[in-house]
Structure formats: structure tokens, C-alpha cells
Amino acid sequence: MGQKINPHGFRLGITTEWKSRWYADKQYADYIKEDVAIRKLLATGLERAGIADVEIERTRDRVRVDIHTARPGIVIGRRGTEADRIRADLEKLTKKQVQLNILEVKNPESVAQLVAQGVAEQLSNRVAFRRAMRKAIQSAMRQPNVKGIRVQCSGRLGGAEMSRSEFYREGRVPLHTLRADIDYGLYEAKTTFGRIGVKVWIYKGDIVGGKRELTAAAPAADRPRRDRPSGTRPRRSGASGTTATSTDAGRAASEGTVEAPATEAAATAPSAGQPETTES
């Protein structure tokens, strides 16, 4: 199922984290609906900004929105006018105070969402889909942290009557390995022949020290021990079948049994003042 499922959801809690962080009891459905509306608002108004990810965090009276973008100048606007407009729209939507953080993406060629968006923009500009896919793969593989990439396009490719899917892959993309750091992006290109879906998987190596591996690699001293009952049976060595004791009393008892023949021999031996008797 690693070939079908979303890589982020498949590794959630293992190598990836939640993109919405908050707790709610009775307002759970309302908050989810609000999160979807926030992401839709940012996606529709900022198509050219190159938004890679949106993280939402809630407190009692405040909503924090982190926007990861490759073009922060478009999101901020001249003298911050665009950022103020976005903040006002979000406060009107959530009816709470909104803290807006705009974060720049350093390497957009290694972010799957931005790669998919770039391929989709080329398809909308009537660039051949194979050329766009190969160009995206070449630019991504030049990044030092990228170990493998897979790009897939689905739809009426080249204006064909029947839709199909084609993909190109370079390097390793282990979709079944849970410790693998796989970035996934999806974007739709609007063309004259219809919509073409673009999916991108980028493999950035294995994450050593995830939640499960840290728990499994915990030192033995930190793990809870089971208390042995006081009346345990003595251990037996497998070779001779003798009983092995580890207490001081057991050691003394074993030493006493070994030294017993020597004391008996000393008791039967004649003393120095008594003559020895021999039988003729």
C-alpha cells in the first residue's frame, strides 16, 4: 500500500509531524473546517507566491499561521501591505487574533510541492510534459540532500483522446520504508485539453532516531525492570546439573562440604605423643 497512500499520512507520527497542531473537544469539526478554509484562502490568492506548506497552531484566543514560501516578497508585498491584507482576511475568517509568520524556503528545487507546481506551470504554458518532467528531475538531483525523485503526470497528455499516466524516476524512492524521509507534492495544471495532475516524490535519505527507533534503542538501565519474587529457585548449570547458589550462605555451605573430608582425616590421624599401632 505504500505505492498508493499519501507518504505524509503513512509516516505520520514516525518521521513526519502534524501540519495542524491544536486540541479541541466539542469544536473539533469546526476547527477542521476552519483549517480547510484557511488553506484554501491562501492557495487561491497566492498562486504565484510558491507556497510550499502552511502550518496552523491554535491557542485559546490566538491562531498562528506559518507560511513556507519560495517567494516571500510576493506574500509580504510592498511595505507589508499584502501581509496586512492576508492577516485581516484570516482574522475575519477565524474571528480571533492571527499571528502571521512568513518563512522563506532555501532550496525550492528539493521541495516536492514546489517542484510539482513548477511542472504544472510549464504544462499550462504548453511546454511538452516529458521535457518539463526531465528538467525538474535534473534540477532536483543537483541538490546534495536529494537521493531520488519520481515525477508523474496524469491526464490527457499531449492532447490525446484517452487519458494516461507517465512517470520518470531517478535514484531511489523507497515508498514502503517508514524511516525514509519522503517529501510528497501534488498540483493540478489547467490546460486547454483539461486538467493534468502532477505528483512528485522526493527521497532525502533515512531518518535515524524516529519515535519508534528511539524507543527501541533506549538503554537497558532506563527501561523498567520486573521485580523477582523473593522465593526464586536456584539456578542449575546446564553441564553437570549441579545447583548454583549466589548468596554468601550458599558459598559458605559449598565451601564447608568441600573442606569436610580434610577435617575428618585430621581427626582420625594419630597425635604426635601417641604411638602408632600396627597389626602383624
Swiss-Prot record:
<dbReference type="GO" id="GO:0003735">
    <property type="term" value="F:structural constituent of ribosome"/>
</dbReference>
<dbReference type="GO" id="GO:0006412">
    <property type="term" value="P:translation"/>
</dbReference>
<keyword id="KW-0687">Ribonucleoprotein</keyword>
<protein>
    <recommendedName>
        <fullName>Small ribosomal subunit protein uS3</fullName>
    </recommendedName>
</protein>
<dbReference type="InterPro" id="IPR004044">
    <property type="entry name" value="KH_dom_type_2"/>
</dbReference>
<keyword id="KW-0699">rRNA-binding</keyword>
<keyword id="KW-0694">RNA-binding</keyword>
<dbReference type="GO" id="GO:0003729">
    <property type="term" value="F:mRNA binding"/>
</dbReference>
<feature type="domain" description="KH type-2">
    <location>
        <begin position="38"/>
        <end position="106"/>
    </location>
</feature>
<feature type="compositionally biased region" description="Low complexity">
    <location>
        <begin position="237"/>
        <end position="270"/>
    </location>
</feature>
<dbReference type="InterPro" id="IPR004087">
    <property type="entry name" value="KH_dom"/>
</dbReference>
<feature type="region of interest" description="Disordered">
    <location>
        <begin position="216"/>
        <end position="280"/>
    </location>
</feature>
<dbReference type="InterPro" id="IPR018280">
    <property type="entry name" value="Ribosomal_uS3_CS"/>
</dbReference>
<dbReference type="GO" id="GO:0019843">
    <property type="term" value="F:rRNA binding"/>
</dbReference>
<dbReference type="GO" id="GO:0022627">
    <property type="term" value="C:cytosolic small ribosomal subunit"/>
</dbReference>
<dbReference type="InterPro" id="IPR036419">
    <property type="entry name" value="Ribosomal_S3_C_sf"/>
</dbReference>
<dbReference type="InterPro" id="IPR009019">
    <property type="entry name" value="KH_sf_prok-type"/>
</dbReference>
<keyword id="KW-0689">Ribosomal protein</keyword>
<comment type="function">
    <text>Binds the lower part of the 30S subunit head. Binds mRNA in the 70S ribosome, positioning it for translation.</text>
</comment>
<dbReference type="InterPro" id="IPR001351">
    <property type="entry name" value="Ribosomal_uS3_C"/>
</dbReference>
<dbReference type="Pfam" id="PF00189">
    <property type="entry name" value="Ribosomal_S3_C"/>
</dbReference>
<dbReference type="InterPro" id="IPR005704">
    <property type="entry name" value="Ribosomal_uS3_bac-typ"/>
</dbReference>
<dbReference type="Pfam" id="PF07650">
    <property type="entry name" value="KH_2"/>
</dbReference>
<comment type="similarity">
    <text>Belongs to the universal ribosomal protein uS3 family.</text>
</comment>
<dbReference type="InterPro" id="IPR015946">
    <property type="entry name" value="KH_dom-like_a/b"/>
</dbReference>
<comment type="subunit">
    <text>Part of the 30S ribosomal subunit. Forms a tight complex with proteins S10 and S14.</text>
</comment>
